[in-house]
Amino acid sequence: MPEEGVDLTEKGKLLSSEELVRIAKIFVDEGVKKIRLTGGEPLVRPDVIDLVAKLKALEGLETVAITTNGIVLAKKLDALKNAGLDMINLSLDTLEEKKYAFITRRPMAGFHKVMNSINKAIGYGYTPLKINCVVMRGLNEDEVTNFVGWTKDKPIDVRFIEYMPFDGNRWNDKKMVSYQGSTD
């Protein structure tokens, strides 16, 4: 999250559930089998439960997935499961509360909400739960082995993602840890 925050897109500029389902149907009719709702943060949509249910009802669509920051996932998980959500990817860049607060610009309590969401999702059978971790120089590159250890005995698959070094319209690779650099 940028230090200055982000401007939210006006509601009128977002696709409605009906528009999303109409577009999804076109893709499914052309052979797409899996649709993933991503963001921003898809769980802030007030109609996300209805959207998941409508997507799940599309004939030929096998999988409805979501990528979330996990902050409100635990609160919405019952309804999402009942709507037919098949898979969850959760973004988590650190296993340390203070780093979490710094990286996300959220209170440390958010970290506990995310961990609660992870445990609840696993309890609901979303396994393997997929965790996306963006590795950033000077922030969390020292935690890669911690993530591996944390997931060793849990039904969690962690995927380490290279930081995309865009700074406005400029390329800024100061925080980037390349795949090659992480294996050296």
Which residues does each PLM region occupy?
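Proteins with a high burden of low-complexity, intrinsically disordered sequence enriched in S/T/G/P/A and R
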Residues: 1-4, 32, 65, 178-184
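Flexible glycine/acidic-rich beta-alpha junction loops that bind and position SAM and/or redox cofactors
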Residues: 137-139, 159-184
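Radical SAM/AdoMet-radical enzyme domain recognition
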Residues: 14-36, 45-157
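A short, flexible beta-alpha/helix-coil linker loop
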Residues: 4-8, 97, 165-168
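Conserved G/P- and acidic residue-centered "switch" motifs that form tight phosphate/ATP-binding loops
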Residues: 41
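Canonical Radical SAM [4Fe-4S] cluster-binding loop centered on the CxxxCxxC motif
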Residues: 1-17
